[in-house]
């Protein structure tokens, strides 16, 4: 049986009505998150209703980009060929200074230097047709 490898492209975001402003801010390298206009809680991922007070009012606010590493996993075997060149890579949960936790990739940090609680900052990686946030050292 002949095994064929096909070139895969990196999956990108599919913005919807709730997330379009977020993805636009990421593309501009200036991340903004929703903030509830009633309780002033920042939230991620964008939603129509605040998970804290159930208000439907929100605005978009720039975030500092400061974060700390909450958890991580080093992926040695990518699930698709699109990530093969980057393997092993780090999938991280980071807690932003404004409160929300988000999943991203931790880049430019040697694996042996990764530590829970380490200070990070949000940066951006541009791909063909889209931009993703990543975490790096400050």
Regions from the language model: what does each represent?
Residues 1-31, 137-138:
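A broadly conserved sequence feature marking short terminus-proximal activation segments
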Residues 30-33, 47:
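Residues immediately within or flanking Cys/His clusters that coordinate Zn2+
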Residues 4, 99, 103-138:
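Well-ordered alpha/beta subsegment
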Residues 35-38, 49-55:
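Short, cysteine/histidine-rich loop/knuckle motifs that typically chelate Zn2+
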Residues 72-77, 126-128:
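Short, conserved beta-turn/loop elements at beta-strand boundaries and strand-helix junctions
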């Amino acid at each position: 049986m002949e095994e064929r490898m096909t070139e895969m492209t990196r999956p990108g975001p599919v913005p919807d009505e709730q997330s379009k402003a977020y993805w636009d801010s990421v593309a501009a390298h200036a991340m903004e998150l929703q903030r509830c206009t009633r309780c002033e809680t920042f939230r991620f991922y964008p939603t129509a209703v605040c998970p804290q007070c159930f208000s439907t009012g929100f605005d978009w606010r720039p975030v500092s980009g400061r974060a700390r590493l909450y958890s991580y996993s080093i992926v040695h075997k990518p699930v698709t060929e699109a990530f093969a060149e980057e393997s092993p890579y780090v999938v991280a949960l980071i807690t932003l200074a404004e409160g929300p936790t988000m999943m991203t990739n931790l880049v430019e940090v040697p694996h042996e230097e990764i530590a829970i609680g380490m200070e990070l900052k949000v940066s951006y990686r541009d791909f063909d047709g889209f931009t993703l946030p990543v975490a790096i050292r400050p």
